[in-house]
């Protein structure tokens, strides 16, 4: 997610004849039934313990499921299906490995969200929910050994902090240590989390609401995101995607507590392209028409995400910061020894992958605040405060990651859930 500072979704066979059963001793039946019951209980326990494990054990051949394939529907892309097909089939091994890494990350993302979605209930703290998501990611990526590292920047693991933004907060909130916020029945919560494999990031998000009065808000945003996915393609102008998203989003209304609201796009929030180890690659995919004639290009990865709001449709940075990322490139060595030591921890565990303060706590850096603020002031680390619409409003988000192959696009993070 990018905040645009400039503007700052029997046929049944006949049963055979059965002969009369032979008489059986009642004690034998009871004994057999008891044995069978014990076996069933044992089987159930065994199955329950194998719900989450390293994804490599589930796919020993290291070939992961492809995402949803979609044709390019724009006329100027139709010729690519024939002209580029042979070139696609002759792609380098490096390209195929990159795609497989993204499919692996996407499969992990699907399995994590499947494992946590039915567990998230009102009454849970946001910290409990964040731990559910992140521990699941660690399990499936195999980065949970000894609990001593959150991530290995050149391997695989958590791609950025788990966003759990409530109601008018649209993005960039995850609980810091000591946060006691409890999820309530009337809340609308955006769940935005990422998985990376060798730096190739899967960025995907969904919204949870328990009260059915928010259904139309969620439907509007899901429809808008799917519209953005449909419009995306090689040589497509970014402003055209934003225009299509805006038209769909604004066609929805939602009634909340007896008051009707038009669903508005959060006009200064955007999707984005994704580069290795860099969640924001430089291109922004608007969710309103903005006149940006920059085009999407072949083989690029994009996170198509949309945010809908019952408020003003504009967010500002507000509240305690939890999200951080080291800026790419070379930087001067911090003069403060604690900042220098913290930077070493960040380099070793995250690189340019975003992190949060809880991750530093987990690494034993529980007295990091002053050193972290020093790195931010010196321009070495970027801070990403929460992004809020007006209080009393509600925001929703849906997001998928896709690859623009020469002949088709692949929505790698697509699942049965959204």
UniProtKB/Swiss-Prot annotation:
GO terms for cellular component: cytoplasm. GO terms for biological process: proteolysis. A divalent metal cation 2 binds at residues 203, 272, 305, 399. Gene3D superfamilies: Creatinase/methionine aminopeptidase superfamily, Winged helix-like DNA-binding domain superfamily/Winged helix DNA-binding domain. Its main location: cytoplasm. It is an enzyme of class 3 (hydrolase). Belongs to the peptidase M24A family. Methionine aminopeptidase eukaryotic type 2 subfamily. NCBIfam families: met_pdase_II. It holds the Pfam family Peptidase_M24. Its cofactor is Co(2+); Zn(2+); Mn(2+); Fe(2+). Keywords: Aminopeptidase, Cytoplasm, Hydrolase, Metal-binding, Protease. It comes from the Eukaryota. Residues 38-49 have a biased composition (Basic residues). A divalent metal cation 1 binds at residues 192, 203, 399. It comes from Kluyveromyces lactis (strain ATCC 8585 / CBS 2359 / DSM 70799 / NBRC 1267 / NRRL Y-1140 / WM37). Transmembrane segments: none annotated. Binds 2 divalent metal cations per subunit. Has a high-affinity and a low affinity metal-binding site. The true nature of the physiological cofactor is under debate. The enzyme is active with cobalt, zinc, manganese or divalent iron ions. Most likely, methionine aminopeptidases function as mononuclear Fe(2+)-metalloproteases under physiological conditions, and the catalytically relevant metal-binding site has been assigned to the histidine-containing high-affinity site. The lineage of its organism: Eukaryota, Fungi, Dikarya, Ascomycota, Saccharomycotina. It catalyses: Release of N-terminal amino acids, preferentially methionine, from peptides and arylamides. InterPro entries: Creatinase/aminopeptidase-like (IPR036005), Met_Aminopeptidase_Type2 (IPR050247), Pept_M24 (IPR000994), Pept_M24_MAP (IPR001714), Pept_M24A_MAP2 (IPR002468), Pept_M24A_MAP2_BS (IPR018349), WH-like_DNA-bd_sf (IPR036388), WH_DNA-bd_sf (IPR036390). Its EC number is 3.4.11.18. This is Methionine aminopeptidase 2. The keyword Cytoplasm applies. Cotranslationally removes the N-terminal methionine from nascent proteins. The N-terminal methionine is often cleaved when the second residue in the primary sequence is small and uncharged (Met-Ala-, Cys, Gly, Pro, Ser, Thr, or Val). Substrate binds at residues 172, 280. It is found in: Cytoplasm.
């Amino acid at each position: 997610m990018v905040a645009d500072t400039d503007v700052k979704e029997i046929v049944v066979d006949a049963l055979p004849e059965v002969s009369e059963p032979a008489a059986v001793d009642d004690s034998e039946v009871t004994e057999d039934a008891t044995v069978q019951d014990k076996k069933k209980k044992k089987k159930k326990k065994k199955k329950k313990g194998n719900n989450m494990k390293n994804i490599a054990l589930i796919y020993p051949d290291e070939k992961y499921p492809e995402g949803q394939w979609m044709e390019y529907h724009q006329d100027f892309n139709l010729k690519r299906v024939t002209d580029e097909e042979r070139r696609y089939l002759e792609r380098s091994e490096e390209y195929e490995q990159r795609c497989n890494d993204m499919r692996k990350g996407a499969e992990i993302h699907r399995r994590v969200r499947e494992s946590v979605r039915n567990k998230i209930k009102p009454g849970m703290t946001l910290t409990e929910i964040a731990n559910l998501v992140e521990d699941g990611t660690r399990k499936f990526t195999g980065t949970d050994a000894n609990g001593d590292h959150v991530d290995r920047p050149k391997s695989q693991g958590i791609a950025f902090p788990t966003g759990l933004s409530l109601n008018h907060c649209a993005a960039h909130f995850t609980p810091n240590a000591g946060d006691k916020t409890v999820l309530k029945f009337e809340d609308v919560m955006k769940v935005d989390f990422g998985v990376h494999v060798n730096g190739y990031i899967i960025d995907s998000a969904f919204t949870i609401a328990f009260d059915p009065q928010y259904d139309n808000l969620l439907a509007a945003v899901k429809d808008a995101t799917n519209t953005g996915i449909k419009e995306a393609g090689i040589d497509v102008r970014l402003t055209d995607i934003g225009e299509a998203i805006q038209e769909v989003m604004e066609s929805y209304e939602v009634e909340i507590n007896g008051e009707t609201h038009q669903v508005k796009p959060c006009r200064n929030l955007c999707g984005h392209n994704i580069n290795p180890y860099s969640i924001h690659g430089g291109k922004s995919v608007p969710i309103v028409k903005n006149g940006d004639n920059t085009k999407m290009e072949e083989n690029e990865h994009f996170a198509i995400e949309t945010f809908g709001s019952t408020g003003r449709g504009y967010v500002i940075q507000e509240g305690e910061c939890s999200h951080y990322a080291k800026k790419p490139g070379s930087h001067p060595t911090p003069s403060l020894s604690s900042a220098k030591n913290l930077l070493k921890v960040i380099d070793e565990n995250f690189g340019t992958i975003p992190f949060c303060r809880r991750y530093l706590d987990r690494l034993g850096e529980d007295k990091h605040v002053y050193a972290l603020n020093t790195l931010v002031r010196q321009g070495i680390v970027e801070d990403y405060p929460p992004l809020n619409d007006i209080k009393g409003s509600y925001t929703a988000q849906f997001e998928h990651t896709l690859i623009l192959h020469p002949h088709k696009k692949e929505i790698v993070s697509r699942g049965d859930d959204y």
